[in-house]
Each structure stands twice: as C-alpha cells, then as structure tokens.
C-alpha cells in the first residue's frame, strides 16, 4: 500500500492519486454542495473541519469511483447497492429530521446551524 499524505482537511489519501483530477473533483463537490443548500431547506454544518473532511472524502470517492459516495458509508462496488449512498444520500432527510444532522454531518437543519454558532 502506498504511503498516505494529508489533504488540507487533515484526511489522508493515496498520494499516487492524480492531483489535477482531485482538484477538479474538489471544485465539482463544492459546486454540488453550494447548489444543494441553496435549493434545499438544509445548511452546511457550521463546523468548517467537518465540512472539509466530508468534502475531501466526497472528492476522493468521485476520483476513485466516479460518483460522490458519502464518505461515511462503505462503497461495495455494486452500483445498485451503492446508489442510495450518493451524496446527498437517500437517508439524509430522515437523519436530519431525527438528529439535526445527516450521518456524516455535512448537512444540518437550520435550527442546528443556528444553535451551533
């Protein structure tokens, strides 16, 4: 296994990953996240460390698997089984309604965001 190096978030990744592809994936993930919170009732977690960790995980999954799979869930390689875990995952609304945040913590309710500030 190749050595691991840190992304800006402190997450670790395979340094053999094409850095240009990773940078493009990060831009694409950031556009998706901004667009989603603009058109949904949810907000990004006010904790920038959480957002960076999840964003970096989404970007790595995009490079490695071609989809923005939620980094808090296992990617099996079976498209039908993995599809519900593409961000925003199919369970995020239920999780936010129940706890104020989705499982990975990137999306939160407006009330959660207000209380966390």
Name each model feature, range by range.
Residues 4-7:
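Leucine-biased recognition of intrinsically disordered, low-complexity hydrophobic segments
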Residues 11-13:
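Short, positively charged and aromatic/hydrophobic N-terminal segments
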Residues 18-117:
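Long, distal/terminal scaffolding or interaction modules
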């Amino acid at each position: 296994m190749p050595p691991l190096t840190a992304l800006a978030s402190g997450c670790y990744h395979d340094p053999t990953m094409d850095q240009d592809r990773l940078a493009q994936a990060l831009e694409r993930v950031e556009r998706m996240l901004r667009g989603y919170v603009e058109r949904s009732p949810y907000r990004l977690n006010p904790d920038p460390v959480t957002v960076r960790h999840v964003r970096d995980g989404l970007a790595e999954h995009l490079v490695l698997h071609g989809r923005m799979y939620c980094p808090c869930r296992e990617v099996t390689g079976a498209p039908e089984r993995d599809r519900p875990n593409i961000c925003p995952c199919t369970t995020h609304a239920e999780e936010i309604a129940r706890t104020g945040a989705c499982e990975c913590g990137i999306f939160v309710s407006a009330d959660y965001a207000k209380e966390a500030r």
